[in-house]
């Protein structure tokens, strides 16, 4: 049973999905959409509403809070879960530092998975 996204990320290895069954992981993989992102593109902006949960398949990004870089993200890491789950504004700005492939799950589908 396939538990990987179209770009090859094994969802079972992503912490937020680690407790899901193979059947549930397969359902998640079918809901995800792959996007190609250019270097310098903004994935999220601090203070804006969050509508998507994202997993990095390839490439890197930097995380900034109030203009200060606080982290770097690499393949297999995810972002956007806090704003999607809580409905609060994005807590950070995330910018691609290289070309990227990301997998996206929108808020409605993400919340349906949690029910």
Where are these regions (language model features)?
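Cytosolic regulatory regions built on CNB/CRP/Popeye-like sensor folds
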Residues: 1-115
